[in-house]
Amino acid sequence: MSGKVFVDGAIIAKRNLIKIKRVPDLLVFSTLSPIMFILLFAYVFGSAIDVPGQSYREFLIPGIFAQTVIFGATITGAGLADDIQKGIIDRFRSLPISRSAVLVGRTGSDVVNNVLVIVIMSVTGLIVGWRIRSSVPEAIAGFLLLLAFAYAISWIMAWVGLLVPSPEVVNNASFMIIFPLTFIANTFVPTNNFPAVLKAIANWNPVSSVTQAARNLFGNTSDKAKTPGAWSLEHPELYTLGWVVVILVVFIPLSVRQYKRAASR
């Protein structure tokens, strides 16, 4: 991609962020759900869930982070589908900007949105008893890894948003895919007691690896709660980065190609 793509992309990203400023409900509702999950699991279910060797709340919060940024990526697909439906993409075609810039701006603005959501969730987590036990560089690496994974997922959602006819379909399709992925994982409970088949799926689920990587980097881990024998969870940072690279390599070209088709309809 040339430098012009990123300059134009920054302009598109600013346009998307201004929309959040003008309609703050978008940010409010994107944070209400994870806050409710934190409060529900911390105060209602948390007393019934035992994580060997550590506080359940410290085990839980990184999982909520992972779930939230992944669900937040659906905004990318829904936003693009909405722009197509309202004819905004046709207006972009008339401007002297790179076609790829629309996608770069859309995914970039959603990273900023995820940063805001993570900040709000972190404050909520600190209130309910979550603590970062690692060093500052490790904690920053944990947040960056979560954002990198969310950025990769946003390109999948961008491709989906350019394929389907409306934002509603994007939301329904992404819910059907992402919801099972975030629950057949170690987001809320360790996978040690899962049935054999589900345990194998959960251990190699990239959602589990990004969650475990975040726990490691935040210092929210316990040897007793770790899953032995699964390379993906013994080296979650590498496994997650591998998924990020593969997703970007595959879905950036697919999304750009699909955008060109959508823009030429």
Placement of each model-derived feature along the sequence:
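Aromatic- and glycine-rich beta-strand/loop motifs that create alpha-glucan
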Residues: 1-33
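Short hydrophobic, aromatic-rich alpha-helical segments embedded in or entering the lipid bilayer
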Residues: 6-12, 183-229, 237-238
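Pore- or pathway-lining transmembrane helices of multi-pass membrane proteins that form conduits
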Residues: 28-32, 166-186
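Hydrophobic alpha-helical transmembrane segments of multi-pass membrane transport proteins
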Residues: 36-41, 57-128, 149, 157, ...
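Alpha-helical transmembrane segments of multi-pass membrane transporters/translocases
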Residues: 38, 42, 215-265
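Short helix-capping/hinge motifs at transmembrane helix termini and TM-loop junctions
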Residues: 41-50, 128-133, 137, 164-166, ...
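Transmembrane helix-loop junction
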Residues: 42-47, 82, 91, 126, ...
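Alpha-helical transmembrane segments and their short interhelical loops
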Residues: 99-174, 235-255
